[in-house]
C-alpha cells in the first residue's frame, strides 16, 4: 500500500493517521490471535516524511513491540529536531528502538552533536619535540596517546555529500559511499 498526500495541505493528515492506526491494530490482532504471536510474512512500513504525517498516539510503544510480531519500520526524517518537536520528552525512544541508523548529512546542530556522540572517541598518537639553544642547549621528545572524538559535531556537519555514516546495533560505525 502506497499513500501520497499533498505536503502543502495538512487537512488530509488525519486520514493517514487513521489508516496507520487501523493497519497497526489489525496486524497486531492477526499476529496475537491468529498467528501465534508472529505474522507469517514480515511486514515493513517505509515511513518517508515521518515527521510530517499524523501518527498513532502510541507510536513509541508500537515501535518498541512490533519486532516481536514480524513488523518493522523504516523511519525517514531530516533531523532530530523534527522528532523532538513531535515527541517532546520521549523523542529518544524512536532512535533507541531502531537497530540501524543511517546519517546522510544535514544542517541541524543537535543532530550533528548526536551523531558525534554516537561515533564515540578514538585514540591518536601525539609526538612533540622541543629544543633550547644556548650554552647548554637541550632537546626533548614526548610521545603521548590522546583521546579524540572520531568526528566532532563540526566535522559531522561537513560530511561529504557522497558519504554516509551507518550505525548498526552491535557493530562499530561504518562510513560508506
Language-model region placement:
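Conserved P-loop NTPase motor cores
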Residues: 3-141, 172
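Conserved P-loop NTPase motor module
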Residues: 130, 136-177
Amino acid at each position: 500500500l502506497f499513500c501520497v498526500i499533498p505536503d502543502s495541505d495538512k487537512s488530509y493528515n488525519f486520514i493517514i493517521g487513521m489508516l496507520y492506526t487501523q493497519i497497526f491494530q489489525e496486524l497486531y490482532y492477526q499476529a496475537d490471535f491468529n498467528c501465534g504471536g508472529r505474522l507469517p510474512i514480515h511486514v515493513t512500513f517505509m515511513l518517508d516524511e515521518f515527521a510530517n504525517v499524523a501518527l498513532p498516539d502510541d507510536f513509541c510503544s508500537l515501535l518498541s513491540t512490533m519486532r516481536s510480531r514480524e513488523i518493522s519500520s523504516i523511519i525517514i526524517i531530516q533531523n532530530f529536531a523534527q522528532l523532538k518537536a513531535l515527541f517532546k520528552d520521549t523523542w529518544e525512544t524512536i532512535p533507541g528502538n531502531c537497530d540501524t541508523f543511517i546519517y546522510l548529512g544535514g544542517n541541524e546542530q543537535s543532530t550533528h552533536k548526536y551523531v558525534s556522540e554516537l561515533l564515540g572517541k578514538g585514540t591518536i598518537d601525539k609526538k612533540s619535540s622541543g629544543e633550547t639553544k644556548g650554552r647548554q642547549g637541550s632537546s626533548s621528545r614526548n610521545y603521548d596517546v590522546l583521546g579524540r572524538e572520531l568526528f566532532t559535531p563540526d566535522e559531522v556537519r561537513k560530511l561529504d555529500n557522497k558519504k554516509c555514516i551507518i550505525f548498526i546495533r552491535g557493530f562499530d560505525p561504518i562510513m560508506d559511499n
